[in-house]
Amino acid sequence: MTNLRKTHPLMKIINHSFIDLPAPSNISAWWNFGSLLGICLMIQILTGLFLAMHYTSDTMTAFSSVAHICRDVNYGWLIRNLHANGASMFFMCLFLHVGRGIYYGSYLYKETWNIGVVLLLTAMATAFVGYVLPWGQMSFWGATVITNLLSAIPYIGTTLAEWIWGGFSVDKATLTRFFAFHFILPFIITALVIVHLLFLHGTGSNNPSGINPDSDKIPFHPYYTIKDALGLMFLLLILLSLALFSPDLLGDPDNFSPANPLSTPPHIKPEWYFLFAYAILRSIPNKLGGVLALLASILILLIIPFLHTANQRSMMFRPVSQTLFWILAANLITLTWIGGQPVEQPFIIIGQLASMLYFLLILVLMPFAGLFENYMLKPKW
């Protein structure tokens, strides 16, 4: 009798994707983040579903309904804390996953990379509309500030902003539609994840050396299922530690006050995972310029495959590119810090320098480093 796993139409797909999938024998722990992101997505959808059962998307009751979830619903506090901190874990894994892709040249699988960038943008949109739902002070003012950026678009900007709001400001209509978006987007993300995997399994995984691994492949199960399980243990350890011991560590105290359109918080800032982009937005004194820089900071990922000048795919044996990569990582941490600081000196100038360095590194220095390394590798005799 043939194995059902290899013959059943549905089981066969799962088998080829997660069990008998040929994987390079040398992929490191940096390749764990794909599976961790899948698990994060499942956690977010499940906890979100249970939260949606008790949440009301009305300006009068939204804040109270979140308080009700935490106080009166069985384990509601845990579900909410897992959902809020699960988003942080999701973005932590996302950033590490993208960083891995840049370091090891995975972006040369262009289709997989482009779908990945679309996934990142969709996840950011989902997190943004989700942050508005508790209808606290930072929810309201964050929504007001970010949606207001649309009005910077010439000619159609104001009309577009009012169309998104469903009125002349962020109000009941905005909250209702943001809840609808927040509910549907994770399922769109799930569909995109399947497409992402489809393209990835068309080419096979990259590996740290960046050379073709076809001559040395091993089955995904049991080798990488057990390796991913270890990563999962670490993920759950961090997530549960956050959710159970310091659930509000990454949140903003202003969000414990109900939304009040008549009182602006002293410092309006988004969640930590958007601070780098927020710092780039604020570093340009012009509104439209800031919006364009904000978009460029993420969309720049789409042109990275075309900026690859090195003869080697991975940065594993390219010390100059490695140095620039870690400068870029430190620069992003600096931008994240600046995004959370008030708009005053010396933070303004630090933010402007860090924003400039961000684009300079990706657009100029890293491509030049690739060319320089090619030159250094040529025999000189």
From Swiss-Prot:
This is Cytochrome b. It is a multi-pass membrane protein. It comes from Antechinomys laniger. GO terms for cellular component: mitochondrial inner membrane; respiratory chain complex III. A ubiquinone binds at H201. Pfam families: Cytochrom_B_C, Cytochrome_B. PANTHER family: CYTOCHROME B (PTHR19271:SF16). The gene is MT-CYB. Component of the ubiquinol-cytochrome c reductase complex (complex III or cytochrome b-c1 complex) that is part of the mitochondrial respiratory chain. The b-c1 complex mediates electron transfer from ubiquinol to cytochrome c. Contributes to the generation of a proton gradient across the mitochondrial membrane that is then used for ATP synthesis. Heme b b566 binds at H97, H196.
